[in-house]
Amino acid sequence: GGRIYGLVGHNGSGKTVLFKSICGFLSCDAGFISVNGKVIGKDKDMLNEAGIIIEEPGFLRTWSGYHNLEFLYTLRNKKDKKHLYSVLEEVGLDPALRRPVGKYSLGMRQRLAIAQAVMEDPGILILDEPMNGLDKNGVKEIRELLLRKKEENKLIILASHNREDIDVLCDEVYEMEGGVLRKL
């Protein structure tokens, strides 16, 4: 199986900066970051191997969730539309829903962001507060999804303010405080 690493810390502790650095969106002031033996910034394929949720994704608000995912999927020369339907169902969204994303609740947009992160079956998932805005049932469904991804040998890095999410899901937990990372 895979591994789930948890990241906790107060607002402003540096969690999002760390995630952006892991993703290669920010460069390190000193040293380097490697994930699965690949040095971030030097290996351009890293971003292609990761499913990422860092902040509110920039979905096209007048398009449906399905059409947003379809657009991103076809940009990558993927054509299996049935797969998109199954991904939406897996995160608890009705693929036939034609409502524009701008009319989605926060929880529905979060489910769509999770669908985007997992739709290409990446080996690595980098998830900043993936359960944000979800109701109790949604949290349960996404926890189950993440545990399935772990069983599929995925590497998951998960930040959460909800200690229960961390305790239920994570194999190892790290704390960010004042820009310093330490294992708990």
What are the functions of these language-model segments?
Residues 23:
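Helix-to-loop junction immediately C-terminal to a conserved catalytic motif
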Residues 31-46:
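Conserved ABC transporter NBD signature motif
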Residues 114:
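Hydrophobic anchor residue at the start of the ABC signature
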Residues 8-10:
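The feature captures the beta-strand-to-loop junction immediately N-terminal to the Walker
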Residues 70, 81-96:
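Conserved ABC ATPase "signature" region
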Residues 125-129:
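Catalytic Walker B motif of ABC-type/P-loop ATPase nucleotide-binding domains
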Residues 160-161:
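H-loop/switch region of ABC-family ATPase nucleotide-binding domains
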